[in-house]
Amino acid sequence: MRLYRDRAVVLRQHKLGEADRIVTLLTRDHGLVRAVAKGVRRTRSKFGSRLEPFAHIDAQLHPGRNLDIVTQVVSIDAFAADIVNDYGRYTCGCAMLETAERLAGEERAPAPALHRLTVGALRAVADGSRPRDLLLDAYLLRAMGIAGWAPALTECARCATPGPHRAFHIAAGGSVCPHCRPAGSTTPPLGVLDLMSALHDGDWEAAQGAPQSHRSYVSGLVAAHLQWHLERQLKTLPLVERFYQADRSVAERRAALIGQDSECG
């Protein structure tokens, strides 16, 4: 079979034998691809460093029966350099990569929209100019939208009556009107569903102006919605949540100390 080229994001890798690795790629035109990268663990490897997770590459591959073979790699974006040295960015990026793999569908099914979204999200994480929690929730919402799982935010998930509606029910598919509201629905604080819509639509001015309490609530709803569709939690999300909790605790203590200094002055 003929060689083929495609742009790809390296999602993960694991060892094979003494010198090789198996890499999982999210490609633009061939979807999820698993391939053997021969000799990349040797110090003389020509492209071992280009096949690390978070890398955006142009790859040439040879189709195989079970696994393809990587024959050439050209680096497009080396996001890892700005992600792996910051634990907050790293956990956020790992959650994105895991989500991409879970939502990519069958192997070799073209995934141009998910590939484009993932590249843009990793670029934003590496850049560090936007809050990581908002970037992750925006990515998860949009990735679910590509998969057909986006929660209803502006209309009732059951009868499509235009909103806004106050109630939200995961199994029903998002916001629900008073007539369709099932038992067990939650009523998020005012502004929470607006924040979810802003993240989904890319209204960063509105998203970044939301209070931290709303951001935390949104993270819980988004994670629960994704978990319900995947039927299990992402392995990386607990790491993200623990980091954000610790990060917020430090920020709160810092704010308290600043307040004390102001009062003493």
Swiss-Prot record:
InterPro entries, A to Z: ARFGAP/RecO, DNA_rep/recomb_RecO_N, NA-bd_OB-fold, RecO, RecO_C
Keyword DNA damage part of the UniProt annotation: yes
Top-level lineage group: Bacteria
Alphabetical keyword list: DNA damage, DNA recombination, DNA repair
Record has DNA damage as a keyword: yes
GO biological process: DNA recombination; double-strand break repair
Any one GO CC term of the record: bacterial nucleoid
SUPFAM superfamilies, sorted: ArfGap/RecO-like zinc finger, Nucleic acid-binding proteins
Pfam families according to UniProt: RecO_C, RecO_N
Family: Belongs to the RecO family.
Matches recorded under HAMAP family: RecO (MF_00201)
Biological function: Involved in DNA repair and RecF pathway recombination.
PANTHER family: DNA REPAIR PROTEIN RECO
UniProt protein name: DNA repair protein RecO
Species of provenance: Mycobacterium marinum (strain ATCC BAA-535 / M)
